[in-house]
Amino acid sequence: MKALRRMMAGLVCAALLFGRAAGEASFDFTDGMPDVPETAAPTENPAPTITLSPAFEMTVIRPAAQQHHGTILIYHTHTWEAYRQTDERYQETEKWRTKDERYNVVAVGEALTRALTALGYTVVHDTTAFEPPKLADAYARSLTMLEQRTASGEAYDLYIDLHRDAISSTSTIRRTVNIGGEDAARFMVLVGKGTTGGYREMPDFAANLHIAELLTDKLEAQCEGLSRDVKVRTGRFNQHIAPRCILIECGTNENTLEEVLCGIPYLAQAIAETLDALEAETAINNVE
């Protein structure tokens, strides 16, 4: 349990970034988390915003004026992407991947869902495993899900395909940034042009790139180095399905899950600020 205390301390390392004021919301990141042996190493300086009865709880203090409205879809085309093994080892499906949703990107998506919900958003987190039976066809299967949602009349203010990036152990890419004494994994937004593959339906690349750049700027404004530069690829990545589609890489295979979760409150805040900026731009354009 002490090892879990250390892991959860990372979750709250940025909780006060929202500012202390009248409104507050709580969300528990530990639903479904595995039990940890009592022999695990103790933590230093545990975060004061964790309540240990009966489960760890993260309390985000924020002004009532920051309550947001909007809908967000989070899903994972590469559902089994996972992180560097720690003392809390998971069963690998293959190298850097696991079916266990407590340890793969689904756990990150769940944490982001709770953080955004606490900010007032309506979030749909689709945890469908799109990788089996063959990883190469995962985008075709996630596209089917998106098409079915669109056909049923669903529409969202932001579509997020949440991934984990892959780098080599010798890569010079910086793995983490320090936030309040804790190491947090870095994020990266990816957008596709759709220029390869012979597609007839193309993404709104310029609009998606604008969103990616806004989100990157909002992350950097909170903590320099928290975001890597926007990555532009020639593929489509299903970003043609609707306006405002982005792919977010949450850390890399060289990060731990703890490091990724440490940055989630910052990512949620950056997403909120990005959507606020887009709403303001729309209002200005409507006036003009």
Where are these regions (language model features)?
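Active-site-adjacent mobile loop/cap segments within catalytic or ligand-binding domains
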Residues: 225-288
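N-terminal Sec-pathway targeting helices
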Residues: 1-10
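Short, charged, low-complexity patches
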Residues: 105, 204-208, 212, 257-264
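Catalytic cores of processing enzymes, dominated by hydrolases/peptidases
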Residues: 141-149, 157-247, 251-252
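N-terminal catalytic or cofactor-binding beta/alpha core of small enzyme domains
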Residues: 11-157, 165-172, 265, 273-279, ...
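A short, flexible beta-alpha/helix-coil linker loop
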Residues: 81, 130-131, 195-197, 253-255
